């Protein structure tokens, strides 16, 4: 029934964001509240990205030391990944998005005139807060259902460059980090 479908979708969303597969069976701007987007989905996006980074740090340390006795503290790696890498980068990318016109507010829908001259109601919300961690953590669950192809989520060429950079920077940094740990 319809009620059980809602619970199934909620369970699926929760589990998929917890394990970083970010399967999204809803359109973010209309399927979730601002609170849920900011304090549940975004939290999972930070935690799942930091979990992958922390696990990789442990693997790199074990390769470098050639022993499993000194791989470090997973929880320390997790907190450092969130507070020293993901959060600062998210703030910088979010600031760029705001400067370029990505919505950041709680105003609801706005009326716009399309290229064809028709008026249409378009959702907006805390998009500039959610997009950076979605991109940095290579998460699939975006604020808008069509993700970065939505004109409000990615309004200019500069936002497109910032979002593409955000997807690539952490995986590329992991390659350099492996070289640092192995001294090569």
Residue ranges and their predicted role:
Residues 8-11, 56, 68, 126-129, ...:
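Alpha-helix initiation and N-capping motif
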Residues 9-18, 23-31:
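Long, highly hydrophobic alpha-helical transmembrane signal-anchor segments
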Residues 12, 52, 60, 64, ...:
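Generic structural signal for short, flexible, solvent-exposed coil/loop and linker residues
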């Amino acid at each position: 029934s319809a009620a059980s479908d809602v619970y199934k979708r909620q369970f699926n969303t929760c589990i998929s964001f917890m394990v970083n597969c970010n399967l999204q069976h809803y359109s973010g701007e209309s399927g979730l509240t601002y609170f849920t987007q900011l304090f549940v989905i975004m939290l999972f996006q930070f935690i799942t990205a930091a979990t992958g980074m922390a696990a990789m740090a442990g693997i790199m340390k074990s390769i470098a030391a050639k022993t499993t006795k000194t791989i470090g503290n997973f929880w320390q790696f997790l907190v450092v990944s969130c507070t020293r890498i993901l959060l600062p980068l998210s703030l910088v990318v979010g600031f760029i998005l705001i400067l370029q016109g990505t919505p950041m507010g709680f105003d609801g829908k706005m009326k716009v005139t399309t290229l064809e001259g028709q008026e249409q109601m378009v959702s907006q919300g805390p998009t500039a807060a959610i997009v950076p961690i979605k991109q940095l953590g290579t998460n699939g669950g975006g604020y808008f259902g069509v993700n970065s192809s939505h004109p409000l989520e990615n309004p200019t060429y500069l936002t497109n460059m910032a979002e593409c950079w955000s997807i690539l920077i952490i995986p590329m940094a992991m390659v350099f980090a492996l070289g640092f740990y192995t001294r090569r």
